[in-house]
């Protein structure tokens, strides 16, 4: 089958920089993705786009919902807050959230515990999957277990983090209206990232666990910043130690850092239907891998050993929420790209 006109035009420069055997691997991975509702696929190495393709409803300048892939922005935003002297990962949340101070368990929660999803607070807060609470609703969520004792995936910790950041911005008088305004000023604007949309709650605050919609290229730019240690055009945009901490796991889940998945044996995934944890052992055999992942198999892969960023976006998020990962395999997809 002949490549689409969009693929051909976009791929002209890529062919010049990627050997023919690499292009063949990328084409095979594209076919695998497209057959599973894929609408965008991009490979970047050492900051240069090697392959880029759009199918179906995908377009180069069309943003696509990241679903829970949105979560990984929070870990890097925390590293920017550390650089600005507004936050420490080891600080108690109760320093900023007085609602936590008199609570047996919540008084011991650190910022890192929130972002590791081991705060002791139920991640879903008793809500159905995809139901995001307001900041106030999340802040009222109780804790019934010691901090660090259990991994609990869901939107509640991210919305609590959003309120914590909002209060810090108000106290510091940064001029940022909310966490998204801060994220935009500190990271998105310097990188040239322009979210197409970002969902907000009934309180007017941006959702941090989901809701971002950006282009494949913009997601790749974000991934490249992380691979580069937070340095862009010679300038450090975040605290390097705090960024490194994004990829340090908790004792409760060896496969999750500060908002990033790190597939390895013993990993606890986001849910029984996600398919992520089931491939943790095989994925660990591909080398060092960090991943932002969302429903519908939205993916941002970071492969430090290859200095490579891979973006995959897909249609059918709602369908995925109902039926799980389907026959998608991260291991198969990455093996096609890497020739592993």
Predicted regions, residues:
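Structured C-terminal helix/loop/strand segments within mature extracytoplasmic catalytic/sensor domains
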Residues: 289-340
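Active-site helix/loop module of the DD-peptidase/beta-lactamase fold
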Residues: 83-119, 170-210
């Amino acid at each position: 089958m002949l490549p689409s006109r969009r693929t051909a035009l976009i791929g002209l420069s890529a062919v010049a920089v990627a050997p023919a055997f690499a292009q063949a691997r990328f084409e095979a991975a594209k076919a695998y993705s497209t057959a599973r509702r894929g609408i965008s696929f991009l490979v970047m190495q050492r900051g240069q786009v090697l392959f880029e393709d759009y199918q179906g409803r995908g377009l180069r300048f069309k943003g696509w919902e990241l679903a829970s892939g949105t979560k990984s922005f929070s870990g890097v935003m925390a590293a920017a807050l550390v650089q600005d002297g507004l936050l420490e990962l080891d600080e108690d949340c109760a320093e900023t959230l007085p609602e936590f101070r008199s609570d047996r368990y919540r008084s011991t929660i650190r910022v890192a515990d929130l972002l590791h999803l081991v705060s002791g607070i139920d991640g879903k807060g008793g809500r159905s999957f995809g139901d995001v609470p307001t900041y106030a609703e999340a802040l009222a969520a109780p804790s019934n277990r010691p901090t660090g004792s259990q991994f609990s995936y869901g939107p509640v910790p991210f919305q609590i983090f959003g309120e914590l950041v909002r209060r810090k911005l108000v106290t510091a008088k940064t001029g940022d209206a909310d966490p998204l305004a801060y994220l935009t000023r500190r990271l998105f604007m310097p990188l040239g990232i322009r979210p197409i949309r970002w969902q907000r709650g009934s309180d007017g605050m941006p959702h941090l666990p989901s809701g971002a919609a950006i282009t494949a290229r913009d997601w790749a730019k974000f991934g490249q910043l992380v691979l580069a240690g937070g340095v862009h055009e010679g300038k450090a945009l975040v605290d390097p130690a705090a960024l490194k901490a994004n990829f340090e796991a908790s004792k409760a889940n060896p496969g999750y850092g500060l908002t990033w998945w790190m597939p390895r044996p013993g990993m606890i995934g986001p849910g029984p239907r996600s398919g992520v944890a089931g491939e943790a052992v095989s994925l660990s055999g591909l080398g060092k891998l960090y991943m932002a992942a969302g429903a519908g198999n939205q993916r941002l892969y970071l492969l430090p050993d290859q200095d490579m960023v891979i973006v995959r976006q897909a249609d059918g998020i709602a369908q995925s929420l109902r039926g799980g990962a389907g026959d998608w395999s991260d291991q198969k997809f990455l093996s096609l790209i890497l020739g592993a």
